[in-house]
């Protein structure tokens, strides 16, 4: 989204039409890469620096609000947990927003808790405006901070504070038309599921790296500070500050969660990075003093446990460095260097060219990005591939099945953070490990595996070929089979592929292969594939594919007790359809 000749095209095509985020980081990267180029380390450098400085600023705020102990403990968590480390290594508007909002809060705090100097207010306005251009949730957080200030401000300071708020709004005005344009196109709800009732608890687990050891160290640290500190008061003059921290941490979650449930799913863990440091400041504020030696031991323990769980429990440095596009092209251009390969992906063409230059090898490819290709066109494209090996990334399940129908031997599979890369071969290769799918049901209407619905009245036996066919002649419902989903995918994770060999003897008509998940006689998931969409030729046997991603179908529900998966053929127009195999 940076490959534009001028600023106007960047805003129009890279931001207003190509993104849902404010323009700030796009503009930063546009000019930054024009100066330093597109080396990966240089592109990420501003974000790495932002993450490092955020550690320091979080310490300054904790010290300003409470004391150095609170600041150091907060900084220790910002420095050592996956949440903050991850987004310091990604060129996205999260760690920049973290730094900007921390600086905003720092100067806001100096204005309220120290001398009311105009320079603090000016810098608060500047960083608030920057937050509004960085991310919609950093804008939301800036608004929450600003409103909280109205309840703290003294009468004599109301006018300059209100004027500062007006200045922030004025500085955001140039971006309003971009925001409205993005809003009119809808959000990310087309691919992001609504949050579940477990969202908050899962988020807390994410912060503490899903580690019981990290939780135990946190609890032990809080208990130790309370017991060892000189004194503890929940109702001293710091009470007001603690309530502010509670609001700052919880309100963005509550607003994002409510909006995602009632209007459009938007909330993700990444968006909450701007408010998370204040959770640590709150937790580590209930004390007055602690010896330097004890504090050093506590901080050392926090860092040690967080680093060990990050490296070994989370296996962070194994999975994070296997990024989607890089892994795709490593598999295609390095691992399969000796093969004649073809790449099918969903990359912006620039990515392909970038990695061709990086690995000094070029391969023919097809990208779905901006191609607007339907399933029939995709099938025709695959059938025309001349190479012997195909490497794929970011394909739908039905598309993968089409590829495998022409390249039946799966010789490679690599997965990681947000990616799956498959390698298929047209012929069985010597010394290659063939990855086979598990067959759970099949019928050719003579021999079958699984509990299929009885369609004996539709079966026609051909004595010359010793084969049977299911002939739907005026029938609306054809063969079907049901599975106890808890037996197939007890943890709610799995991919089910269905393949149908079918022929239209008279005319092509609308019929479907259908999958549904049923709970208590109610359909909670439904998916169908129009057989006609596979570009049929009358009187010719062809294959139709349907794929069910159980995790996606259940929207990350982790239990499948009481769920039934049903797959069936629906002949909506009740025309003649012959089925040879399922």
Name each region found by the language model.
Residues 523-558, 574:
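Extracellular carbohydrate recognition and processing domains
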Residues 471-497, 521-531:
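Secreted extracellular polysaccharide-interacting domains
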Residues 427-461, 582:
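Extracellular carbohydrate-recognition regions
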Residues 1-434:
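Terminal, non-globular segments
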Residues 443-445, 483-513, 542-552, 582:
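Extra-cytoplasmic beta-strand recognition segments
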Residues 574-582:
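Exposed low-complexity, polar/acidic, P/S/T/G-rich flexible segments that act as propeptides
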Residues 455-477:
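Short carbohydrate-recognition loop motifs
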Residues 566-574:
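Short beta-strand-plus-loop segments that form exposed binding edges in beta-rich domains
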């Amino acid at each position: 989204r940076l490959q534009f000749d001028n600023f106007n095209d960047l805003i129009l095509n890279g931001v207003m039409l190509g993104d849902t985020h404010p323009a700030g980081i796009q503009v930063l990267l546009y000019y930054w890469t024009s100066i330093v180029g597109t080396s990966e380390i240089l592109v990420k450098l501003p974000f790495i620096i932002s993450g490092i400085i955020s550690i320091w600023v979080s310490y300054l705020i904790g010290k300003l609000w409470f004391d150095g102990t609170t600041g150091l403990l907060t900084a220790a968590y910002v420095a050592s947990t996956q949440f903050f480390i991850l987004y310091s290594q990604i060129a996205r508007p999260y760690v920049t927003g973290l730094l900007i909002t921390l600086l905003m809060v720092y100067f806001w705090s100096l204005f309220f808790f120290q001398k009311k100097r105009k320079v603090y207010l000016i810098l608060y306005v500047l960083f608030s405006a920057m937050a509004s251009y960085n991310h919609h949730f950093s804008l939301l957080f800036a608004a929450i901070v600003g409103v909280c200030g109205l309840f703290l401000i003294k009468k004599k300071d109301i006018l300059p504070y209100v004027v500062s708020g007006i200045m922030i709004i004025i500085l955001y005005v140039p971006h309003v038309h971009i925001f409205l344009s993005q809003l009119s196109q809808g959000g990310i709800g087309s691919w992001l599921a609504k949050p579940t009732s477990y969202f908050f608890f899962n988020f807390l687990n994410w912060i503490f790296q899903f580690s019981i050891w990290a939780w135990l160290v946190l609890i032990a640290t809080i208990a130790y500070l309370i017991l060892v500190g000189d004194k503890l008061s929940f109702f001293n003059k710091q009470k007001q500050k603690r309530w502010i921290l509670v609001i700052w941490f919880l309100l963005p979650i509550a607003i994002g969660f409510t909006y995602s449930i009632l209007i459009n799913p938007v909330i993700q863990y990444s968006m909450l990075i701007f408010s998370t440091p204040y959770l640590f400041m709150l937790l580590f504020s209930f004390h007055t003093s602690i010896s330097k030696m004890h504090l050093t031991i506590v901080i050392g323990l926090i860092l040690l446990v967080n680093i060990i769980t990050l490296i070994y429990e989370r296996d962070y440095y194994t999975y994070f460095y296997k990024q989607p596009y890089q892994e795709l092209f490593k598999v295609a251009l390095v691992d399969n260097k000796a093969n004649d390969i073809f790449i099918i992906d969903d990359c912006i063409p620039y990515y392909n060219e970038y990695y061709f230059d990086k690995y000094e090898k070029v391969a023919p490819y097809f990208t779905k990005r901006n191609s607007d290709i339907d399933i029939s066109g995709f099938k025709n494209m695959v059938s025309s591939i001349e190479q012997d090996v195909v490497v794929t990334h970011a394909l739908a399940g039905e598309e993968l099945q089409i590829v495998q129908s022409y390249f039946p031997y799966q010789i490679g599979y690599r997965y990681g953070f947000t990616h799956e890369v498959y390698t298929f071969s047209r012929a069985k290769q010597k010394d290659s490990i063939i990855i086979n799918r598990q067959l759970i049901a099949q019928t050719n209407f003579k021999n079958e595996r699984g509990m299929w619905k009885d369609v004996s009245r539709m079966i026609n036996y051909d004595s010359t070929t010793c084969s049977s066919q299911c002939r739907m002649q005026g029938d609306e419902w054809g063969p079907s089979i049901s599975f106890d989903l808890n037996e197939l995918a007890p943890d709610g994770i799995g991919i089910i592929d269905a393949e149908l060999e079918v022929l239209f003897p008279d005319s092509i008509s609308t019929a479907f292969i259908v999958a549904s998940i049923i709970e208590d006689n109610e359909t909670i998931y439904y998916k169908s594939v129009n057989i006609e969409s596979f570009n049929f030729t009358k009187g010719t046997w062809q294959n139709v594919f349907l794929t069910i991603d159980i995790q996606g179908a259940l929207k990350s529900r982790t239990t499948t007790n009481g769920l039934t998966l049903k797959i069936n053929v629906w002949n909506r127009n009740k025309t003649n359809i012959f089925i040879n195999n399922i």
